[in-house]
Amino acid sequence: MDAIGPLQLRVMHYIWKNGASTVHAVHDALNAEPGAPKLAYTTILTVMRNLAKRGILNQRPAGRSHIFEPLVDERTYKLSILRQVREDLFGGDLNRLLGLLSEDADLSQRERDALGQASA
């Protein structure tokens, strides 16, 4: 599975958290996020339809609107992306990936220790 873009990911985070949703509900929720740019209803509609075309969401009619529900759960998506990063950037070598992560200056000592234990 290919990675999805930032706006698609915001939509998916909402749906993973709240379950099956209408475009209207997602539009309202994303526009209510503090500091986030305001998005047109048609933008959210297009994003959700594109996610449905990619097999990430299911779209079904419900009266005059449509309900979109996840076909891919959050854990499955994250694992797929992590596997892709491991293969594409580290030749499948998990220790190289963990080694680079441990060099991240933003990590706390506790997080570094956890990475060290994971790679041991």
Predicted features by range, described:
Residues 59:
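Short beta-strand "wing" residues that participate in macromolecule-binding interfaces
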Residues 55:
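Glycine-centered, phosphate/nucleic-acid-interacting loop/turn motifs that mediate DNA/RNA or nucleotide
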Residues 9-13:
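Pre-recognition alpha-helix immediately N-terminal to the DNA-recognition helix
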Residues 80-120:
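Amphipathic alpha-helical dimerization/coiled-coil segments
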Residues 21-30:
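Short acidic, hydrophobic short linear motifs in intrinsically disordered regions
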Residues 5, 62-81:
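Short, cationic-aromatic polyanion-contact patches
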Residues 14-22:
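Short capping segments at the starts of secondary-structure elements
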Residues 45-49:
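Short, hydrophobic-biased segments on the C-terminal half of alpha helices
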